[in-house]
From Swiss-Prot:
Gene3D superfamilies: Creatinase/methionine aminopeptidase superfamily. This is Methionine aminopeptidase. The lineage of its organism: Bacteria, Pseudomonadati, Spirochaetota, Spirochaetia, Spirochaetales. A divalent metal cation 1 binds at D93, D104, E232. Its cofactor is Co(2+); Zn(2+); Mn(2+); Fe(2+). It comes from Treponema pallidum (strain Nichols). Removes the N-terminal methionine from nascent proteins. The N-terminal methionine is often cleaved when the second residue in the primary sequence is small and uncharged (Met-Ala-, Cys, Gly, Pro, Ser, Thr, or Val). Requires deformylation of the N(alpha)-formylated initiator methionine before it can be hydrolyzed.
C-alpha cells in the first residue's frame, strides 16, 4: 500500500532530511586516502546520535549507520577496515530516523586523482538523478522516472542495475512503490500523487548490469568487477511541484 503523508508528516520527514544534509556537509571532507570505511561509519553514528536520531538502517538489520561502497561495490557496502585509496569512487548511503521520520540519500565522492571514465560515470549518474526527479510529478506514472533515468544512461552506454531500485520512504525505510531505473520491467506502475515521498536512486556501472552479493551477505558488487556509481535523493510530491528534501546545503554546494 502506498502511504500518502500528511503535511505534518512531510514536515517531520523534511527535518530528518535536513539533518542528513548537514551530516553530508561534515562527512564528505573526511573521505580521503588512508581512512578506513569503519571510521566514517563511526563518525556517522556519533553525528546521528548527537541530533537525537537513530541510524535508519538498524531497522533493516544492517549493522552500521552508513552503507559505504567503493568502486565495484554498488550498494550496501559493509563498513570495515578497508582503506580508501587515491582514485576510488566512494558511495555514502545514509539514512536517519528522527522522531520516527526517515530520510535516505546517497552521495558518491571521487577521491584524489580519479580516472576520467569514473568521473564521467559520476557525472552521468548525477544527470540520471536530475532527470528522474524532473519526471517525478503529480499525475505522472512511476515508469516515467524509469524511462528518464534509463534514457540518460543509455545515451552514454553505461550499464544500469535493474535488480535494485528506488522506493517510497518516510515512515519506513522501504515503502511502496518500487521505482525501477529500467523501464519495461514487470510490476505496478502507479501514478505519483500529492503527499507521496520517494527515494530516487540511479545505480550505473562502467560494464555489466548484473550484480551479485558478496560473502559478507550485504555488499552488492558488479558481476564483472567494473566500477559502479550510486546517487540518491528523497523527494516529496506536491500538487504543483516536487521538493528535493535532501538537497545539499549551501556548505556542500560551495565546499
Amino acid at each position: 500500500m502506498i502511504r500518502i503523508k500528511t503535511p505534518e508528516q512531510i514536515d517531520g520527514i523534511r527535518a530528518s532530511c535536513k539533518a542528513l544534509a548537514r551530516l553530508f556537509d561534515v562527512l564528505i571532507p573526511l573521505v580521503k586516502p588512508g581512512v578506513q570505511t569503519q571510521e566514517l561509519d563511526a563518525f556517522c553514528q556519533r553525528f546521528i546520535r548527537s541530533v537525537g536520531g537513530v541510524p535508519a538502517w538498524f531497522s533493516e538489520g544492517f549493522p552500521a549507520a552508513a552503507c559505504i561502497s567503493i568502486n565495484e561495490e554498488v550498494i550496501h557496502g559493509l563498513p570495515s577496515a578497508r582503506v580508501i585509496q587515491d582514485g576510488d569512487l566512494v558511495s555514502l548511503d545514509v539514512g536517519i530516523n528522527l522522531n520516527g521520520y526517515i530520510s535516505d540519500a546517497c552521495r558518491t565522492v571521487p577521491v584524489g586523482g580519479v580516472a576520467h571514465e569514473r568521473l564521467e560515470l559520476l557525472r552521468v549518474t548525477t544527470e540520471c538523478l536530475r532527470a528522474g526527479i524532473k519526471a517525478c510529478r503529480a499525475g505522472a506514472r512511476v515508469r516515467a522516472v524509469s524511462r528518464a533515468v534509463y534514457a540518460v544512461a543509455a545515451r552514454h552506454r553505461f550499464g544500469v542495475v535493474y535488480e535494485y531500485c528506488g522506493h517510497g520512504v518516510g515512515l519506513a525505510v522501504h515503502e511502496e512503490p518500487n521505482i525501477p531505473n529500467v523501464p519495461g520491467l514487470e510490476g505496478p506502475n502507479p501514478r505519483f500523487l500529492p503527499g507521496m515521498v520517494v527515494a530516487i536512486e540511479p545505480m550505473l556501472t562502467l560494464g555489466t548490469d548484473e550484480v551479485r552479493t558478496s560473502a559478507d551477505g550485504w555488499t552488492v558488487v558488479t558481476a564483472d568487477g567494473s566500477c559502479a556509481c550510486h546517487v540518491e535523493h528523497t523527494v516529496a510530491v506536491f500538487a504543483d511541484h516536487t521538493e528535493v528534501l535532501t538537497e545539499p546545503t549551501e556548505v556542500e554546494r560551495t565546499g
